[in-house]
């Protein structure tokens, strides 16, 4: 049979170049001159199977295993041997049909690498596979001249190893060693457990006394807790009721303020308008008075002229009088012309003033319209912001019902290291809002804490109060070195649609930057979904990518998108609420400023309109006066012409008088009209004065009412603060002392107290004193006694289990000993049947027998070999010659191969001490045994070579470098002769 199929070597000793030897026959001879490296095959086999002794490997150090170099070949950096075995008959302890084992070592390292079928392995695994096949140290599977000497000279106990390999009980021996080791460990453990049990009994007795005291402490403390919590909850609810009353009073007063303050502002604005109107009416009265004076002046002039005409009519004019009259008329015409020029200049100025006023009025109206539009827009924005405020309050209230993180923040005074939800610390531009919120997801509501201890404490608080679960971000334990590789960043920067990394667009305090980096430093922002897909492909789908619209491409290529209702976090709502409140305040301030500006503009506009009306009245008066003067001048000119060109005409004088009377009638009518207007205007002024007085009285009343409401509001707010402090103190005490929320306390401890308030507080003080008098309490004793008892029970069970294990292991050892003893003894009996036959064949007679040194203890007994060559009676093997010693060892080996064949035997010049006749017997018996065993024989003897199926030659064509080649048998004599001559 062929067990070793292939031998491959590289860099091992003299094998500088890689060589491969395929074994196809069961009896192969390896021949060659001394020093050619043929025995390196044996060293290689030992080395692969784990031989560590440098002496047995014919070396001084591990580096001696590696080719040292020659004149033509450099030194190798490593040595490598690989052996391939046929395991189709399952001779090895492995199920694979072919087993390849390899060992490799590097120069200078001293560390070996082992492989089984190219897979990394350990020496222990290799040794386990090759157990009981005769290739281990001390076995007859590898025999050299040194092995023969060892076999003969070895102590009986050392020689036993050979027979154990042959019997196959090595596996039992190893199993027994394992069981014995396990038994020893179990016995040690049993002793240790016994010591622990005794200590636990003492501890249990001590803890029992401590636990009884602790339980009494707990009973008193629980009574104190129940009573104090009931009192605190009752006081809290009472304070809450009073607080609600004050809040109602505050809301009512503020509501009244909202009603009365606008009324006061309206009245004050109305007074301004009424005063403006009164001033306008007063100015109009002055203008009418002036106009009335002008009418009276005109009437006087007309009456004077009438007197003149009347005189003319009664007396007539003489020529002398006419000349004097003409001169007087001429002078009068010049005076009237001067007066006319003055009125025309005033008229021109009045027209200019009216034009300027109309322009200013139009500009003022435009400003008023703009202000009104701004007020309308501001009002619309204010309505929107107030609606948004309502929505935010509703969302905030809804979120607070389930936001456990908020509860922890609210109760931060009862805990340590609680900061706030992550969202409250982050700021980012509106452009990236959807992307960053999508990237953060639920983590925006995670609770930031200082360290792991704070998180653990908060979790205990949540569990105790049955609140729910919260995810924590401990600042001292987050990994902040996560980032996109530089290589990928360079690629991303060159691609369209890349807008950066999320963490770069978030602003926060440096304290929270590690948290931001952990969550966002590997999340990319893309312009749109197409860009995101492209970026993902270029980065091998290693990163998560979010778009500006909130779509996501996950690592691995999964895409998420579509409409999504925003899930606002508490932090985000708080920020939005703050912005909303600021916007409302700003808009309300704007509204007040705009209304104030509008009132001022309207007052100015009224003033301008009054000025315009006044100028228009003046203009009308100037026009009317100009017409009158022109008419007088015309009449005077006509009269002058009559005086200078004609004599006195009585008829014309009469006509002039009639015309004067008509003018007087018109003037008197105008006088009456102005007097009527003055009367109406006076009545208007009286009415306005009355209205102003009534409004001022109402303002006084409203201010008094507001002062009264303000005083009530101050009192209510003081009461509110007082009860808020009471509520806060109670809440803080319940949080800090009892580690529970107020809501939980109300839900579980709102119970009636049968004692009065004073009695309840006295009992609380008494219970507290009772607790203080108990001294030091080991509260953990209750839990410890339970744990100790459990541990005692567990260890006692372990002790009993160990006792049972000891019995089982002892039983297993007995069974292993029986099986191993039987199998070993059967081998010895079979050997004693075969050994005499083999011995007689090799020696040509004589006797040989194997005996126990201690027959009563087969498992540990040494093995003696008693050999008597023909004609000799030898008491000690050391007395045999070298050839006889070799034959004895070979007799035992070949007998073992007949009884329990080894799959592979290596003989390294084992027959060198034999004479030719014995060499021939040696070769014949190997040939017979090769049917069941593969032999590798390193030999110089021709008799051995002739029986081999195949010969492998080893030679050094280059000094220091071994080459191998197949040698035909007809050439074997040539090599042998050359070797013998050497």
Swiss-Prot record:
Residues 171-231, 280-310, 337-377, 575-718, 753-822 form a coiled coil. InterPro entries: P-loop_NTPase (IPR027417), RecF/RecN/SMC_N (IPR003395), SMC (IPR024704), SMC_hinge (IPR010935), SMC_hinge_sf (IPR036277), SMC_prok (IPR011890). ATP binds at residues 33-40. GO terms for biological process: chromosome condensation; chromosome segregation; DNA replication; sister chromatid cohesion. Keywords: ATP-binding, Coiled coil, Cytoplasm, DNA-binding, Nucleotide-binding. Its main location: cytoplasm. Belongs to the SMC family. Required for chromosome condensation and partitioning. Contains large globular domains required for ATP hydrolysis at each terminus and a third globular domain forming a flexible SMC hinge near the middle of the molecule. These domains are separated by coiled-coil structures. Homodimer. This is Chromosome partition protein Smc.
């Amino acid at each position: 049979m062929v067990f070793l199929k292939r031998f491959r070597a590289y860099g091992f000793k003299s094998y500088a170049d890689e060589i491969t030897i395929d074994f196809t026959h069961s009896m192969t001879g390896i021949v060659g001159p001394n020093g050619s490296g043929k025995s390196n095959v044996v060293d290689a086999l030992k080395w692969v199977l784990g031989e560590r002794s440098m002496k047995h490997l014919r070396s001084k150090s591990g580096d001696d295993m590696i080719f040292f170099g020659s004149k033509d070949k450099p030194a190798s950096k490593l040595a490598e041997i690989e052996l391939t075995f046929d395991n189709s008959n399952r001779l090895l302890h492995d199920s694979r049909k072919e087993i390849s084992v390899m060992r490799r070592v590097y120069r200078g390292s001293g560390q070996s690498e082992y492989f089984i079928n190219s897979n990394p392995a350990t020496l222990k695994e290799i040794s386990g596979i090759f157990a009981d096949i005769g290739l281990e140290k001390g076995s007859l599977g590898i025999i050299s001249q040194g092995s023969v000497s060892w076999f003969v000279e070895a102590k009986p106990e050392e020689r036993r190893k050979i027979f154990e390999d042959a019997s196959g009980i090595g596996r039992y021996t190893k199993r027994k060693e394992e069981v014995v080791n396990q038994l020893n460990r179990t016995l040690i453990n049993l002793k240790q457990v016994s010591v622990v049990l005794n200590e636990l009994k003492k501890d249990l007795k001590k803890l029992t006394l401590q636990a009884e005291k602790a339980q009494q402490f707990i009973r008193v403390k629980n009574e104190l807790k129940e009573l104090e919590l009931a009192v605190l909850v009752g006081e809290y609810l009472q304070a809450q009721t009073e607080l609600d009353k004050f809040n109602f009073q505050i809301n009512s007063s503020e509501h009244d303020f909202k009603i009365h303050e606008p009324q006061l502002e309206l009245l004050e604005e109305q007074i301004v308008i009424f005063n403006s109107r009164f001033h306008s009416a007063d100015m109009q009265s002055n203008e009418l008075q002036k106009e009335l004076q002008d009418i009276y002046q005109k009437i006087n002039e007309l009456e004077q002229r009438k007197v003149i005409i009347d005189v003319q009519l009664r007396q007539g004019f003489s020529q002398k009088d006419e000349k004097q009259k003409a001169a007087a008329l001429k002078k009068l015409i010049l005076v009237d012309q001067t007066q006319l020029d003055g009125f025309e200049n005033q008229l021109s100025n009045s027209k200019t003033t009216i034009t300027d006023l109309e322009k200013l009025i139009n500009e003022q109206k435009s400003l008023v319209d703009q202000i009104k539009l701004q007020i309308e827009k501001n009002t619309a924005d204010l309505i929107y912001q107030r609606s948004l405020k309502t929505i935010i309050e509703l969302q905030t209230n809804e979120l607070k019902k389930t936001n456990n993180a908020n509860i922890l923040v609210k109760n931060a005074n009862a805990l340590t290291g609680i900061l706030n939800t992550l969202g409250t610390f982050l700021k980012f531009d509106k452009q990236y809002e959807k992307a960053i919120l999508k990237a953060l997801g639920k983590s925006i509501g995670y609770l930031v804490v200082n360290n792991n201890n704070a998180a653990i404490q908060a979790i205990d608080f949540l569990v105790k109060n049955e609140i729910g679960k919260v995810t924590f971000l401990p600042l001292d334990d987050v990994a902040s070195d996560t980032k996109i590789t530089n290589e990928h960043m360079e690629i991303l920067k060159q691609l369209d649609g890349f807008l950066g990394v999320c963490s770069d667009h978030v602003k926060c305090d440096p304290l929270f930057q590690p948290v931001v980096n952990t969550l966002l430093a590997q999340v990319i922002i893309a312009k749109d979904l197409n860009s995101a897909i492209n970026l993902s492909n270029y980065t091998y789908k290693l990163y998560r990518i979010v778009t500006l619209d909130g779509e996501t491409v996950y690592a691995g290529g999964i895409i998420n998108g579509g409409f999504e209702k925003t899930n606002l976090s508490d932090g985000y709502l708080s920020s939005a609420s703050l912005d909303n409140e600021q916007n409302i305040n700003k808009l309300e301030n704007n509204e007040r400023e705009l209304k104030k500006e509008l009132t001022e503009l309207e007052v100015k506009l009224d003033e301008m309109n009054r000025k315009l009306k006044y100028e228009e009245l003046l203009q009308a008066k100037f026009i009317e006066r100009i017409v009158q003067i022109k008419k007088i001048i015309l009449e005077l000119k006509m009269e002058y012409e009559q005086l200078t060109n004609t004599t006195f005409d009585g008829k014309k004088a009469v006509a002039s008088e009639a015309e004067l009377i008509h003018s007087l009638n018109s003037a008197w009518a105008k006088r009456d009209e102005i007097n009527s207007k003055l009367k109406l205007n006076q009545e208007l002024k009286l009415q306005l004065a009355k209205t102003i007085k009534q409004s001022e009285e109402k303002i006084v009343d409203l201010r008094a009412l507001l002062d009264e409401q303000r005083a009530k509001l101050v009192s209510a707010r003081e009461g509110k603060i007082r009860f808020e402090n009471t509520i806060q103190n109670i809440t803080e005490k319940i949080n800090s002392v009892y580690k529970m929320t107020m809501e939980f306390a109300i839900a579980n401890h709102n119970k009636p107290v049968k004692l009065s308030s004073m009695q309840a507080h006295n009992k609380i003080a008494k219970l507290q004193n009772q607790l203080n008098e108990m001294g030091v309490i080991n509260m953990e004793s209750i839990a410890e006694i339970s744990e100790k008892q459990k541990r005692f029970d567990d260890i006692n069970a372990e002790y009993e289990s160990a006792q049972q294990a000891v019995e089982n292991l002892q039983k297993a050892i007995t069974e292993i000993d029986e099986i191993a003893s039987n199998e070993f003894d059967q081998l010895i009996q079979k050997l004693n049947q075969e050994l005499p036959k083999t011995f007689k064949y090799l020696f040509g007679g004589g006797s040989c027998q194997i005996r126990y040194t201690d027959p009563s203890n087969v498992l540990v007994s040494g093995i003696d070999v008693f050999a008597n060559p023909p004609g000799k009676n030898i008491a000690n093997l050391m007395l045999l010659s070298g050839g006889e010693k070799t034959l004895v060892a070979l007799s035992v080996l070949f007998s073992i191969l007949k009884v329990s064949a080894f799959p592979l035997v290596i003989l390294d010049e084992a027959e060198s001490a034999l004479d030719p006749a014995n060499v021939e017997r040696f070769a014949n018996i190997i040939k017979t045994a090769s049917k069941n065993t593969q032999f590798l024989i390193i030999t110089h003897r021709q008799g051995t070579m002739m029986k081999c199926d195949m010969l492998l030659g080893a030679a050094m064509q280059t000094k220091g470098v071994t080459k191998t080649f197949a040698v035909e048998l007809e050439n074997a004599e040539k090599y042998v002769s050359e070797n013998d001559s050497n």
